[in-house]
Amino acid sequence: MSSLRDQLAQVAQNNATVALDRKRRQKLHSASLVYNPKTAATQDYEYIYDTALESFHTLVSLDLRFKVFTNSLFSASSVTIDRNVQTKDQIRDLDNAVNAYLMLISPKWHLTPALHATEWLIRRFQIHIHNAEMLLLSTLNQYQTPVFKRILNIVKLPPLFNPFTNFVRNDKNPTDLTLIKLFNDMDFLKLYSNYLSKIIKQKVTYTNQLLFTTCCFINVIAFNANDEDKLNKLVPLILEISAKLLASDSSDCQMAAHTMLAVLATALPLNKSIIIAATETILANLKEDDARKKALVTISKLFQTLKGVGNVDQLPVKIYKLVDNSFPFEYLLQFLSNENKYSSDKFFTAYIRSVIRYDHDKLSQIVKILRKIKLEKYEVRFIITDLIHLSEVLEDKSQLIDVFEYFISINEGLVLKCLQALNLTGEVFEIRLTTSLFSVKNSAEQSGEDIIKVLDDAKASTANGSAVPFKDFMTKNSEFISTKAESMLLVKDEKFVKLLSLFVEAVSKGYQPGLFLSSFFTTLESRITFVLRIIVSPGSPVALRLISLTQLSKFINGIDEQTDLFSLVPILVTALMDISRSVRSNTKKVLQQIAKRPFTAKYFLSNVLYGENLKVPMLSPKDSKFWLTNFLSDYIVESTDISSLVIPSKNDMVYMLFWCNQALHLPLAYSKTIMLKLLTAVPQYAFTYSKVFEQFMATYITERSSWETKCIKNKTNFKDFETAVCAIVAPKEKNSFAIDFLINCLESEYEQLSNIMADRILSLYPTLKFPNQLKIVQSIIDSSVDKELSYDGLETLQSLPLTADIFVSVLKSNTINSEDQTDLTKRRRRRSSTVNKSALQKQDISQIAEAHLKKMTIILETLDKLKVKSNENLLNALFNLLSDLETLDHDGGLPVLYAQETLSSCLLNTISSLKSNNGSMKLPSIRADILVAAIRSSTSPQMQNKLLLVVGALASVSPETILHSVMPIFTFMGAHTIRQDDEFSTLVVERTISTIVPALLKSTEVTNKSDEIEFLLMSFSTAFSHVPKHRRVSLYSTLVRELGPSDVIAPFLFLIAQQYSNCLEKFKIAESKNYIEFFKAFLSKFDILEQLHGFNELFNLVELLDEDSSKNEVAPTRTLFSNGIVNMSKSELFVLKKNDLDFIDKVIGESKSDYYNTSSNLKLRILSTLLDPNIEIEVKNQVRNEFSILLSKTLNAINMTDSLSYDKHSSAGSNDEEAGSESEAEVDQKELKDILFGLLEHVLDLLPIQDFVASILPLLQGNTDESVRHHLTVVTSNKFIEEPMESFETANEILSTLVETTEKASESTQILQVTLNTISSIVTRFGDRLDSHLLVKSMENSCKQLTSKKIELEISSLTVLTTLIQTLGVKTLAFYPKIVPVAISIFKTYQNAKNNLKEQLQLAIVLLFASMIKKIPSFLLSNLQDVFVILFHSDEVADSVRLSVISLIVEHIPLKDVFKTLQKVWTNDVSSSNNSVAVSLFLSMLESAVEAIDKKSATQQSPVFFRLLLNLFEYRSICTFDENSINRIEASVHQIANVYVLKLNDKVFRPLFALVVNWAFNGEGVTNTNMSKEERLMAFYKFYNKTQENLKSIITSYFTYLLEPTNNLLKQFISKETVNVSLRRLVLISLTSSFKYDRDEYWKSTSRFELISESLINQLTNVEDVIGKYLVKAIGSLATNNSGVDEHNKIMSDLMISHMKTSCKTREKFWAVRSMKLIYSKVGDGWLVLLPRLVPIIAELLEDEDEEVEYEVRSGLVKVVESVMGEPFDRYLS
């Protein structure tokens, strides 16, 4: 029975749509899927129904299944149906109809009619409330659409859909994580499973819904991947859902189930029974082809998850039949071919084992599966073991042969191990399967033992089974009995194979071999030839071959002595190559047996052995005997190569002919293979013997198929056979039929034959004569073009050792232009003609031309690959071919680009080979104009590059050949090639330059070489901006290096600077920087002399731009000035010059990038040259000379600047315009001067310091321009900053000059300032290493400048004095009066003034005093107060700097003087300044001094410190800061005072403390009379409280000094004479801490206790609420301190009770109760005896009128008392 809650919930659900009031009805009616609530509220049911009915009819037209709802949900009567008044049955029917409709509408929510139709159900039947679950389930897969969001806004969420709560009436759609949370609920999964069952049953599933379901379940599995328990709970549910989906006829449902099962099995491996059941379910209803593949993949994945024992056992028979019916064998093969990405070995192992167990008809086909799948080793072992067991019972064992051959081919050892595990051997198993299988044999085995084993096994098997009498066996197979005296070597393979199988079967059944042979072969000839064929048959088991040898030996004994058995020897010799040692050993015995017989001319079966009436030439008996005897004596069983024994060196021609004939006529493929291998392996084999095989070679290709069939049937390796056949073609072959055979094999349609012969050619080709070589090469080329070859003709061709003559011959035979290109009279290039074009348009000729192009391509590829040793004829032929390709390109329009590129490579290789062999040579027959024309006409940059390389290579071999084409080539390169951004193009240009330019320079035919060079530079520099940025340095450095750096750097620099100028004028700043970066990197490729020389020559070129120089005839005539410079105006020339100099300046100067790239740092290069001891002195002098020239040219340019003038405008302007023009000229000249000064600075910075000083001293000492001297002085300062200390002598030289400058009265302020700054920099760097006389002189001059009244000079002088004091120390004492007073005066002068240099001045003064403090501290004491004042008031100086100076003061100045000075400074300056920073710095200094002072000094200076301390206490009354700032200052003072007190002993501190008490209470020693007593008391008590916290019980007794005053103060608080809450709080805190830290029973003294207790407790009468808690703590602490003294307890109790009486004030009683509660909570046991007196008081208070008092007593005091007594307090009240 359901609970009451459930019943109520059901009632609420049923009445959810019952609305008794209008507002609720309106709200229910306004819930709409389409309209907003306001619109929906105004609509009636008729309107809604009409709209919905129209949409419903649209749905019916789309899907007729909706028609069923015509008479129910969408009937006309539905308008009047009210769900709330329906019966249960009617409601049930309505719900069923709605649910059916929702399941059917699910895939159509994206359609507008679906929304409008469903709108009716929502508005009329409230399905969003009563059918909410089905509505949500049917739309769940639409969770990311607006429709679902609308549904969430109106639906009443069922409990299981709680994860959607946050998305109700929200703009956001549910997330994927929300769906995972939803599906992670087991109850919801069950609900969804039921829903799936319904839609599957109703057949209303659809793809998107199934895809959504699948994804959700996969996400849930993935979400719980690490929770095995949860996965185990999911398994039954997912299996149930999968079963329902699989039961559906829909392929989509089935594939959804497949996916879920596969994912589940991957996440949680299932046991085998579940997987078998799942497999059965999957296969039970598998009908659609779409689902079949997915089903197989799923089954494979399920099986792949199996682990442990039995995971690859055969399938149950029922499952196997289902698999076989669902997946035909061919389907499985196709699946394995296409789906290699899936691991399915376990399923297919189980399937194969099932085939072995149940379905033997498919045994022969399982090899196809095995070849397509990779199995684990253990799986292979299971299958092999099953097959071995099957071989015992299977009738037709031939079905197993292919399978075992496959397993043996991949792992023969494993098969043998499986046999051994079952007590079987390989030989026995071969007998069982009636075939030869194994190739790996034990070398120690013996034939006798093998035979015994075979016979024993056969007998055992016969005994176990029902033995068939031999007579019956013979009768059954009587059709195969041979009665003719025939050679069994000639019998058809089918018959032989059958006889072989019968022989094996007979042996395996235990029949005697002799009985079988004598019964089935009635003649001796047939018996012997049969066993002979078995011996050399690869398909016969080893045991059978041994038996056959034994039988042959017996048969030989039965032949008469007159018959010569040497005719059997050739076949037996081939048996000596058997893999089995036992076979070889027994064969040797048979040969020995034959050797013992007489040799006669009567050969056994001489005319019928190899064919009817086929007479094979034989050896004479004598030769036969000789050969066999020697052979057996030399043969060893272990031998693997017996070719030298077969063809002995003596009488080798006879034996070669004999064995060649034997090889020719042998009908057995295996024996023929062995014999041919033996013959072709001996060195005697030559073309004379290959004639024997002429007919065989002529017919082989046509008969190849029959030979292949023979090999297959006899298990002979056909590839080995064909290799032996191809080897018939002998080295040094001369026979044309053999060459034809070779060519025919290459051109045959058989891939194996072609490849074998192609490999054979590689070894034969070098031994052939030239005509045959040419014939083979030409045939390969022709066949490669004419037909599709079975081998790689091009690879074969490229593998042959072809010579240049071969290529020349081939090229000549394949040429188009017949005219002689080498004829010197025909210098003009052939032009493409209309005749050629029209001819090549014809189809047949066009095809010929295409074939010709293909041939040429093959030839060129081969030549390019081989790189043969070349000659001039080959080069001529290649040039002719270049002309041919142009013809095909221009006239025929054929795609010759690849051929041209390959030809270019061939030309390069050929020229390189000629150069390495012959060096320089003349090639008059070569046409360079062909190359130039090809370069120009080609549209391919790569082709152009390669041809340029050819030009360069040709120039290195024969310069005259290309000399006349130099300019066109370079013009083309400048316009095209150097613009390509690839490594190859760059390499081409560099190589072309490096080859052609030297030829140009060496040539005697070229005049005006400088013009040519400048034209060349202009061609390349014009294309600079188009050259890829990272290619420029390499390209242009190569060009300049080849042209000659000493002559070319300057013109090239000039051209680049001109482009730099153009960029600046066009405001392309970023691009202009690229030129500077480029040229720095460019110059790094040359040595320093070349760089300096280039700069000097560039100055010469720049000078030509001046106005006067422009009239010079040199400038216009130079090629360098032809690109627009000659036509420039004067103003344009001036701008160009200015920008050129700026370019030089930036190239020479250092930048940030030079820090990381030392190679482009000019300064570093000069230094390394001058300082390197390995460089010769002469070179260093040359560097200095070049630098001198550079410096002189720079200075000359500066001197010439003033004389420059130009007119920007026409002279016909007004005076105003002229004035403006002159102003612009002055600005430009100033800019030019600045550039030149910067250049001068950078030039001077290039040299080492010694050379630098030597260069500038004359300039500084002479009458040089002031601006020049100014810049030189600044450069000097910077120069010395990074110099090592060893340069002090050089520094003395420059310092002397600078000191002299400061002495000159005529010098300007600017010069004096920069000079003083430089002196300071030098002194700072070198210190006392400098000449002391110069330093003193500098001091004197600085003191003079200190009084100059010019702030710039004052700052610089102070800086110099600071460094000098730092350096000289005490030696500067004589200048003290000239420095310190003046500095103090200067500070005061500018202290309140506004000046931009004020900060620098204050900093300079502070640093001056800092250096004095450090170096001469004792002499500064007289002005220490002034120093402190300056330090505290240098507002412009950073606080960190001033704090550092404070540290110096504390460290170097005696602390007693520091304290005294601090006291004076505070009194006289800081206290009255209202400067918070000054106060902060003062306290910082005081703190540092207190921390640094030792105890002895602290004792001595204690009076001074405490006077200062009292002054600091008084600061409160005079400062204007806010209260927080004052409190922070006092907190710092208290902290400093406590640190100081810790360094004093009691003897010293006690009188000082008394002094402070007198100051506080009596006003003794007060300096500020305006300070009130209360302010003093507050300051004192703060100090005392802080000290009490630090010293604790040490100063408890000190309270004696303030006991009476404190008592009086407490009384004043009671009497309200003093009303100061803060002061009262401080007093109470002081008493509390004193009581708390009393360790010497100080307060247990009755006199003190009685004195203080009354005053303290009486504070209850009027204590302020804000400090009441402090009074409670004080009283509690006093009670705790005196808890052991009963008298004191009684006194306190009486006093406390007196404040708790009813007559007392309310707050008085309240705080008294609080105090009593604290007392009892702390010392309750001691006060228990006093409780009776307290009980009446408590009783009265419990009935107090004030609720707060009554509550405090009841909940506070009473509870504490009860806890102390351990019993209820009520009993005392009763």
UniProtKB/Swiss-Prot annotation:
Region feature (Disordered): 1206-1226
Keywords, in A-Z order: Nucleus, Repeat, Ribonucleoprotein, Ribosome biogenesis, rRNA processing
A GO cellular-component term linked to this record: t-UTP complex
Keyword Ribosomal protein recorded: no
Localization annotation: Nucleus, Nucleolus
Ranges annotated as biased composition (Acidic residues): 1215-1226
Any GO BP: positive regulation of transcription by RNA polymerase I
Domain of life according to the entry: Eukaryota
HEAT repeats: 1734-1772
GO molecular function term, any single one: snoRNA binding
Assembly and interaction partners: Component of the ribosomal small subunit (SSU) processome.
Free-text function comment from the UniProt entry: Involved in nucleolar processing of pre-18S ribosomal RNA. Involved in ribosome biosynthesis.
Family designation: Belongs to the HEATR1/UTP10 family.
UniProt name for this protein: U3 small nucleolar RNA-associated protein 10
Provenance organism: Kluyveromyces lactis (strain ATCC 8585 / CBS 2359 / DSM 70799 / NBRC 1267 / NRRL Y-1140 / WM37) (Yeast)
Gene assigned in the entry: UTP10
